[in-house]
């Protein structure tokens, strides 16, 4: 897909853009909120607290001295009190050298408060490391992956923009419209337009649609029983519509991953063994799929469930029962993981069957 030198040019452009982003994070006057740098910290008070569940915590008070780095009052020294708990659930402790965003109303510096830490510099450096490693290790494939990521980000942003101007119930149809575009663009950019890509696109579309229809049908027949939408209670759009749309996106990612892995392996087998019959190649595909299905499903479950660990610990720490904690915090994630895993399982025979037909078509004519 990428010519001999074009990927090197694109690599340099991406690295320069990332370096420019890092440079911009040090241009403090570009931020809307006033920015300050902490120069001295002193703990002035510490109080033990116990809540109604006998959970113990310690509330500490810091006296923070900082210097303004932006606005017309740049260089002005401020002193602010900051309270933080030992648990750090809703607050945090600040240290010397931290950069923080401030809230200053009507230039009343005596009432200034800290909004949050400035973290974008670290994020930009982390992104630079990600891009650099992807280019160094992946080379042309790495650059293609970055381009695909940018295209998909743009498509997803366009999807959200369109959703703002249509009815609340239309997100599912918009997702169904965009998902073949995302699949096609991702695979073509990553692998070029070839037999392997055609197989991957076709099998991803088939397995994703079958899994999505199966999952939505079961959820609808059960009338959404067992699904706890409390974690989405602040959303003003229909929660079940957003959840069902997320099922499509998650299933698409899982199916695409296993499909390209399997079609690549089967294409390699077909290239090395020209006389393979469709049945033999199909069995080879099933065997390869059985080797990767375990790790793929584990990745699916851990990636979905890991995000709920903090909420589970908070609930259990506050004497919530297991019977209450796990359904309310894991029902949606578990459903996403289960349906995504079904997609992985179905993708293996679908990809093996379609690939065995496409990749042995010439062999049958020769015989």
Where are the regions that the model predicts?
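Hydrophobic secretory-pathway targeting helix
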Residues: 1-35
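Helical hairpin unit composed of two closely spaced alpha helices linked by a short loop
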Residues: 257, 266-312
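Membrane-interface helix termini and inter-helical loops of multi-pass transporters
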Residues: 81, 109-113, 223-233, 322-325
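Transmembrane alpha-helical segments that form the functional core of multipass membrane systems
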Residues: 129-131, 140-250, 254
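Short juxtamembrane and helix-loop transition motifs at transmembrane-helix boundaries
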Residues: 102-115, 130-142, 161-167, 268
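Membrane-cytosol interface segments
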Residues: 35-94
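Extended, hydrophilic extramembrane loops/domains of integral membrane proteins
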Residues: 85-121
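Hydrophobic alpha-helical transmembrane segments of membrane transport and translocation systems
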Residues: 287, 291-294, 302-367
């Amino acid at each position: 897909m990428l010519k001999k030198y074009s990927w090197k040019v694109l690599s340099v452009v991406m690295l320069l853009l990332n370096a420019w982003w890092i440079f911009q994070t040090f241009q403090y006057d570009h931020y809307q909120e006033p920015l300050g740098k902490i120069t001295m910290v002193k703990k002035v008070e510490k109080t033990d607290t116990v809540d109604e569940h006998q959970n113990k915590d310690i509330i500490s008070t810091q006296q923070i001295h900082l210097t303004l780095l932006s606005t017309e009052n740049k260089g002005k020294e401020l002193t602010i009190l900051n309270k933080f708990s030992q648990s750090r659930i809703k607050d945090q402790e600040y240290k010397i050298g931290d950069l923080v965003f401030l809230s200053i109303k009507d230039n009343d510096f005596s009432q200034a408060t800290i909004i949050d830490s400035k973290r974008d510099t670290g994020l930009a450096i982390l992104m630079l490391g990600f891009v650099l490693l992807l280019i160094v290790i992946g080379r042309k494939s790495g650059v293609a992956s970055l381009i695909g990521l940018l295209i998909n980000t743009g498509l997803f942003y366009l999807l959200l923009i369109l959703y703002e101007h249509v009815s609340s119930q239309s997100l599912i149809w918009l997702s169904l419209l965009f998902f073949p575009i995302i699949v096609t663009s991702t695979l073509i950019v990553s692998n070029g337009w070839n037999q392997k890509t055609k197989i991957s696109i076709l099998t991803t579309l088939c397995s994703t649609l079958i899994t999505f229809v199966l999952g939505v049908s079961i959820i609808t027949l059960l009338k959404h029983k067992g699904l706890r939408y409390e974690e989405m209670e602040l959303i003003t759009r229909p929660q079940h519509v957003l959840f069902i749309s997320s099922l499509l996106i998650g299933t698409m990612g899982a199916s695409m991953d296993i499909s390209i892995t399997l079609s690549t392996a089967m294409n390699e087998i077909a290239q090395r063994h020209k006389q393979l019959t469709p049945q033999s190649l199909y069995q080879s595909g099933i065997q390869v799929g059985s080797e990767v299905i375990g790790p793929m499903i584990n990745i699916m479950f851990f990636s979905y469930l890991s995000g709920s660990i903090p909420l589970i610990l908070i609930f259990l720490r506050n004497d919530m029962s297991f019977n209450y904690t796990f359904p309310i915090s894991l029902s949606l994630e578990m459903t996403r993981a289960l349906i995504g895993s079904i997609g992985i399982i179905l993708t293996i025979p679908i990809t093996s069957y379609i690939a065995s037909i496409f990749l042995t078509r010439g062999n049958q004519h020769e015989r």
